UniProtKB/Swiss-Prot annotation:
This protein's name: Cyanate hydratase
Function in brief: Catalyzes the reaction of cyanate with bicarbonate to produce ammonia and carbon dioxide.
EC number assigned by the record: 4.2.1.104
Gene Ontology MF annotations: cyanate hydratase activity; DNA binding
Gene name of the record: cyn1
Lineage: Eukaryota, Fungi, Dikarya, Ascomycota, Pezizomycotina
Length: 160
């Protein structure tokens, strides 16, 4: 199994914790799934902590420090603030897989919006009260399929 690593020269907008966490992850040869199981989080949420896009709880910091053998004080210092979300990827993205996700929204965004509005009314799907997961399916022909589930609380627009 290949593991996700980080080339900091390609990601200058990431926080210092990203380099610390990815270096330890590579040294331990852990997948995000393994780390997530240890800290009790979803693997996408765990990866988001590594990329500075999610806030680590004090318990997350303790568990990450223990598992990855990083001094807890270092992680407390690097992960104690609030994430500066949205700065890690230039728009439009250049990385092919991230661009495909962007392209899905470009191609199907209005279709998603229309169907969601018909089902729920005028509003938006929250990215705050939100969860996501990634699964792998293999069909009868042996083809692998990526299944990405997005689950967000529906927030109706208020009338004023």
């Amino acid at each position: 199994m290949s593991l996700a690593t980080l080339d900091t020269s390609q990601h200058p907008n990431l926080p210092s914790a990203s380099a610390t966490l990815f270096k330890a992850k590579a040294a331990k040869k852990f997948s995000f799934e393994q780390i997530a199981q240890h800290i009790g989080r979803n693997e996408v949420a765990t990866a988001a902590i590594f990329y500075g896009q999610a806030k680590a709880s004090p318990e997350d910091i303790t568990n990450l420090a223990s598992l990855l053998e990083i001094p807890q004080e270092v992680l407390e210092d690097q992960l104690s603030g609030f994430p500066d979300r949205g700065k890690s990827v230039e728009m439009p993205p250049k990385e092919p897989l991230i661009y495909r996700l962007y392209e899905i929204v470009q191609n199907y965004g209005y279709a998603y919006k229309a169907v969601l509005n018909e089902k729920f009314g005028d509003g938006i799907m929250s990215a705050i009260s939100f969860s996501t997961k990634v699964e792998k399916e293999t069909d009868a022909d042996g083809n692998n399929w990526a299944v990405i589930t997005l689950r967000g609380k529906w927030l109706p627009f208020s009338r004023f």
